[in-house]
Curated annotation (Swiss-Prot):
Bias (Polar residues) ranges: 55-64
Protein name, entry field: RNA-directed RNA polymerase catalytic subunit
Enzyme class per UniProt: transferase
Gene Ontology biological process: DNA-templated transcription; symbiont-mediated suppression of host gene expression; symbiont-mediated suppression of host mRNA transcription via inhibition of RNA polymerase II activity; viral RNA genome replication; viral transcription
Gene expressing this chain: PB1
Post-translational modification comment from the UniProt entry: Phosphorylated by host PRKCA.
Keyword annotations: Eukaryotic host gene expression shutoff by virus, Eukaryotic host transcription shutoff by virus, Host cytoplasm, Host gene expression shutoff by virus, Host nucleus, Host-virus interaction, Inhibition of host RNA polymerase II by virus, Nucleotide-binding, Nucleotidyltransferase, Phosphoprotein, RNA-directed RNA polymerase, Transferase, Viral RNA replication, Viral transcription
Superkingdom of this protein's organism: Viruses
Family, similarity comment: Belongs to the influenza viruses polymerase PB1 family.
Region: Disordered, residue numbers: 50-82
Entry GO MF terms: nucleotide binding; RNA binding; RNA-directed RNA polymerase activity
UniProt xrefs under InterPro entries: RNA-dir_pol_NSvirus, RNA_pol_PB1_influenza
Keyword Nucleotidyltransferase found: yes
Region (Promoter-binding site): 249-256
């Protein structure tokens, strides 16, 4: 039978059908190959938007830099980065006037954070540009490498463990005439394999010392590595994103802390809150505007889109904002906050891996690294690439491009939101001094603008004034992509508002399904996602019940754990059938052991082990929750774990789920193929680092170490802790005299070894 799809929607209000138009089912597009082309696009576009600025040369690195600030007044419709300093400062002043004490209070809050933050704050985050190896690394490894190099170059302030002291080292490192770094390299040699008697290539990993002069070091310290943004839906072209190195990260963190503190106090800011809290905040602003537009006034809302937000922002503008926000604050505080924007106005963009060439005729492939783009003959490239390279050449130094204007994606979300809100703030009647007025919402580059006026001409005048005011601070509202509606219907950060927020359920679709962590976590995450969507996203009971059944089915296929009495044959069915037959209480078996599903929409909040505990055979309980089971590498039991779920839009969200550690909570082992690559040395460092941290945590359960006091090494701290614990255990009779003596002896030996070293 043919179903006419429009019939499905006859009973559905139009706004509820919005989510069916979203491109959110199926796999998102991923990028392949190098991001070099996208990065060159970004660099070239950014310079084009600011082309009428002044060119200067950085005296330290020799990099050419373009400064568009206070450039020509912008022209209509063309995006441009010519922000006017005095306008930005005035917007800040008015923002402060409307919110007395806001900057002062935020500065005090931030000052406290600055003095207390530990350097391990920087280990959060994923890939980070590691300047010592000139490539991306996990954040913790990149930080460890940086600190190691700092210490071997006599920079030791970081040993206090405070982030601010690590940043002192960063500042000092920039004054050094040269830095000595350790890099990894690999040697290949051909040897005969004893077993097979064939020749094989053996790789050995070495570490070598290398000296870097001041200019090269500065270039590395100011470099942002670039990658292609993956999994972006609804776009034809990919785009580049940046990952900064450890020198920049700490400074950015403090600036964003200050800006976050300000955003929390601004009712128009869509950051840093999210989810339902954000919806409530938005609904308030809308309510205010609709209440005030009595019968005499019209109210219209623009669903706004800004053209190339990041590429028209300017670090110099952020410096002006910070200078204003921190006026009257202590000198050290103002200095530390102004370093991030200064580093960004001298930033370099690393062009990535370069280009791959292949000759079909000769079956040859070769990679042209980014470093060669400055000198290679352009006849090998197609026309569009040739144009890109010609344009970028004057900016190239050692495979990186000088990129003074522009901000790169996602670096100063909070601070740029403050700038956006400061323009929304100017819409009050006391500032517009006429019959129209505006208010709105801002979240990074996304905005919604609500304009009220007595008639249509007034609305038009209000929108024009807003548009022109934005231009003065380097914000370019796109006239093509923004649209206006009677207030009551608009979209903001993928929330659809129609006299209240409409659940956009399709956004959550990608997070339904089996995550692939392990049997225990996957079951827990799966039901938690369904529970959360019932709470937040209008997932009705019938649909939720269906989602649950589909999830269980998916789960059973993933882990091949069909019910013990099923006819389906899989690799596991022999074992599971045997278990099923010898189990008295079959309802007590977990789904992953071939048991029945006892979940329904009323008990989704209970972990499966707890749900079935009373129903389990005793010996099954013993096997399931046995910390001595040799096949399980147990993590310590945390009652709540965090899973990363992928909503369709925006970054991966962290979602809490209840974790009960059982024999199903295994941790998969690392892929072995990494052991044969140049990453091996890094992997060994990482494991070493991990082992030390694990050992340290064994001595200090998380409740007892918050902020280390004084400067003692990890080893000293552990030895003294071991002595104290041993004495307590001995005196309370928990350990024998011989054991106590042995512990004391080991402690003395460790101290002796440290002294000899």
């Amino acid at each position: 039978m043919d179903v006419n799809p429009t019939l499905l929607f006859l009973k559905v209000p139009a706004q509820n059908a919005i989510s069916t138009t979203f491109p959110y089912t199926g796999d998102p597009p991923y990028s392949h190959g190098t991001g070099t082309g996208y990065t060159m696009d970004t660099v070239n576009r950014t310079h084009q938007y600011s082309e009428k600025g002044k060119w200067t040369t950085n005296t330290e690195t020799g990099a050419p830099q373009l400064n568009p600030i206070d450039g020509p007044l912008p022209e209509d419709n063309e995006p441009s980065g010519y922000a006017q300093t005095d306008c930005v400062l005035e917007a800040m002043a008015f923002l402060e006037e409307s919110h007395p004490g806001i900057f002062e209070n935020s500065c005090l809050e931030t000052m406290e954070v600055v003095q207390q933050t530990r350097v391990d704050k920087l280990t959060q985050g994923r890939q980070t540009y590691d300047w010592t190896l000139n490539r991306n690394q996990p954040a913790a490894t990149a930080l460890a490498n940086t600190i190691e190099v700092f210490r071997s170059n006599g920079l030791t302030a970081n040993e206090s463990g405070r982030l601010i002291d690590f940043l002192k080292d960063v500042m000092e490192s920039m004054d050094k005439e040269e830095m000595e770094i350790t890099t990894h390299f690999q040697r290949k040699r051909r040897v005969r394999d004893n077993m097979t008697k064939k020749m094989v290539t053996q790789r050995t990993i070495g570490k070598k010392k290398q000296r870097v002069n001041k200019r090269s070091y500065l270039i590395r310290a100011l470099t942002l590595n670039t990658m292609t943004k993956d999994a972006e839906r609804g776009k034809l072209k990919r785009r580049a994103i940046a990952t900064p190195g450890m020198q920049i990260r700490g400074f950015v963190y403090f600036v964003e802390t200050l800006a976050r503190s300000i955003c929390e106090k601004l009712e128009q800011s869509g950051l840093p809150v999210g989810g339902n809290e954000k919806k409530a905040k938005l609904a308030n602003v809308v309510r205010k505007m609709m209440t005030n537009s009595q019968d005499t006034e019209l109210s219209f809302t623009i669903t706004g889109d800004n053209t190339k937000w990041n590429e028209n922002q300017n670090p110099r503008m952020f410096l002006a904002m910070i200078t204003y926000i921190t006026k009257n604050q202590p000198e050290w505080f103002r200095n530390i906050l102004s370093i991030a924007p200064i580093m960004f106005s001298n930033k370099m963009a690393r062009l990535g891996k370069g280009y791959m060439f292949e000759s079909k005729r000769m079956k040859l492939r070769t990679q042209i690294p980014a470093e060669m783009l400055a000198s290679i003959d352009l006849k090998y490239f197609n026309e569009s690439t040739r144009k890109k390279i010609e344009k970028i050449r004057p900016l190239l130094i050692d495979g990186t491009a000088s990129l003074s204007p522009g901000m790169m994606m996602g670096m100063f979300n909070m601070l740029s939101t403050v700038l956006g809100v400061s323009i929304l703030n100017l819409g009050q009647k006391k500032y517009t001094k006429t019959t129209y007025w505006w208010d709105g919402l801002q979240s990074s580059d996304d905005f919604a603008l609500i304009v009220n006026a007595p008639n249509h001409e007034g609305i038009q005048a209000g929108v024009d004034r807003f548009y022109r005011t934005c231009k003065l601070v380097g914000i370019n509202m796109s006239k093509k992509k923004s649209y206006i509606n009677r207030t009551g219907t608009f979209e903001f950060t993928s929330f659809f508002y129609r006299y209240g927020f409409v659940a956009n359920f399709s956004m959550e679709l990608p997070s339904f399904g089996v995550s692939g962590i392990n049997e225990s976590a996957d079951m827990s995450i799966g039901v938690t996602v369904i529970k959360n969507n019932m709470i937040n996203n209008d997932l009705g009971p019938a649909t939720a019940q269906m989602a649950l059944q589909l999830f269980i089915k998916d789960y059973r296929y993933t882990y091949r754990c069909h019910r013990g009495d099923t006819q389906i044959q899989t690799r596991r069915s022999f074992e599971l059938k045997k278990l099923w037959e010898q189990t008295r209480s079959k309802a007590g078996l977990l789904v992953s052991d071939g048991g029945p599903n006892l979940y329904n929409i009323r008990n989704l909040h209970i972990p499966e082990v707890c749900l079935k505990w009373e129903l389990m055979d005793e010996d099954y309980q013993g096997r399931l929750c046995n910390p001595l089971n040799p096949f399980v590498s147990h993590k310590e039991i945390e009652s709540v774990n965090n899973a990363v779920v992928m909503p369709a839009h925006g970054p991966a969200k962290s979602m809490e789920y209840d974790a009960v550690a059982t024999t199903h909570s295994w941790i998969p082992k690392r892929n072995r193929s990494i052991l044969n690559t140049s990453q091996r040395g890094i992997l060994e460092d990482e494991q070493m680092y991990q082992k030390c941290c694990n050992l340290f945590e064994k001595f200090f359960p998380s409740s007892s170490y918050r902020r280390p006091v004084g400067i003692s090494s990890m080893v000293e701290a552990m030895v003294s802790r071991a002595r104290i614990d041993a004495r307590v255990d001995f005196e309370s009779g928990r350990i024998k005299k011989e054991e106590f003596a042995e512990i004391m002896k080991i402690c003395s030996t460790i101290e002796e070894l440290r002294r000899q070293k």
